[in-house]
Every structure is written in C-alpha cells, then in structure tokens.
C-alpha cells in the first residue's frame, strides 16, 4: 500500500514513508488535517551529513538552498502522497514563504554549531538546528529539544520491522542488501501498475519546474 501511494521504489523514500503511513493512519482516526515538520532540516541544518560543513558556513548555506529546492522530489512527495492515501491533509508550516525568507537570513553558524558534548544544550560535538532548538527551549521539554537526531524510520522502530519483512520476501534468514531491497520494491510497484516503466522512466525528473526528457 505504501509503495502504491508513493509511486516510487526509491529505497530511502520507501523506508521513511512507512512510519509516515502508520502515523497518518492513526491521526486520521481523530483529525482531518495535521501539521508536519518538513522543511525544518533543510532550513536549519538538521541532517547529520551537514556535520561535514560545520566549519564551512558558506558551503552549508548553499547546500541548504539546494536541498530546499529538491524537497518536492523527496520529502514533500512522501508526505503528500502517503497522507492523502489516508485522506489526511498534511500542512507544512516551516515552508511558509515568510518563514523561509526569515530562516535563510539567519547565519549558517547559528544553525550548525560546534558544541561541548557535556553541555545540557548540545546533542554532541556538533549540534544540528541549534538556533531552532534554542528558540523552542521554553516551549518543550529539555530532553525533547536536545535529543540526538534520528532518521524517522530508525526513531520510530519501523526499520527493524522492515528488515524482518524484507528477509521474508527475499527468502533469507540474513540481512537484505540495498540492491535486493530496491529490486523487491520495484517488483511490488510493477505488480500494482499496468505500465510501471512509465513511472520508472520519469521518476526523479521533475526539476526546476519542468520535466526533463528521460
């Protein structure tokens, strides 16, 4: 069901879509619309790979802009399609135009900071989204504000459930590598669409408001 609504066999996209699916299903029992946090990592340097830019603020700012411009093809695709698959409307307040403009005016050195791991206001030697965490320090519990970054599928625990399911589909007792995982997803997608090659041919080609020829 996740792959059907996602219309993608991308490994990372599918992995993150699974906890989104369960969260959307639970939320839809009670509400018709939810607020999500998409955009915060792209605006305030929230990904662990950003650590490589901690001493290169100009390059970090450029990378944040690049990832923000690519969101429609990754995280926003996941959130929009999976939530609508449960008839739930997801709204993204971090992507309000005025907030984007304000966030991009904040120096990159305040978003990703070198910190003392023993400090109460740190997640380690490098702290992501520092200024955003600081701004919310009086609004949310300390342990929540300063918890270490975890990918959605890891933090939710669905990555372990998925590993077991993939092993069953692959007919093995051991771990399934990324290439096998991708093939499993492509097989599931192919089984659900008459002409899946049309999806594969154009997946990921939306860029800068145009469709590139596959």
Question: Where are the language model's segments positioned?
Answer:
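Non-catalytic structural connector segments
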Residues: 166, 170-171
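Conserved S-adenosyl-L-methionine
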Residues: 141-151
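ATP-dependent adenylate-handling active sites, centered on carboxylate activation for C-N bond formation
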Residues: 1-139, 153-165, 178-214
């Amino acid at each position: 069901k996740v792959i059907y609504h996602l219309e993608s066999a991308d490994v990372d996209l599918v992995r993150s879509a699974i906890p989104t699916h369960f969260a959307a299903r639970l939320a839809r029992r009670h509400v018709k619309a939810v607020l999500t946090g998409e955009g915060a990592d792209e605006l305030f340097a929230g990904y662990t790979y950003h650590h490589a830019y901690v001493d290169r603020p100009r390059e970090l700012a450029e990378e944040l802009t690049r990832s923000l411009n690519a969101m429609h093809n990754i995280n926003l695709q996941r959130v929009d399609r999976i939530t609508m698959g449960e008839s739930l409307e997801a709204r993204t307040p971090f992507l309000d135009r005025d907030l984007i403009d304000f966030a991009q005016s904040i120096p990159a050195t305040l978003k990703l900071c070198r910190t003392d791991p023993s400090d109460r206001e740190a997640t380690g030697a490098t702290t992501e989204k520092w200024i955003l965490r600081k701004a919310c320090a009086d609004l949310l519990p300390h342990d929540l504000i300063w918890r270490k970054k975890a990918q959605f599928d890891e933090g939710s625990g669905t990555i372990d459930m998925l590993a077991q399911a993939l092993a069953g589909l692959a007919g093995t007792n051991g771990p399934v590598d990324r290439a096998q995982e991708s093939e499993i997803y492509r097989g599931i997608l192919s089984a659900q669409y008459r002409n899946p090659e049309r999806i594969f041919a154009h997946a990921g080609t939306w860029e800068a408001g145009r469709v590139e020829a596959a």
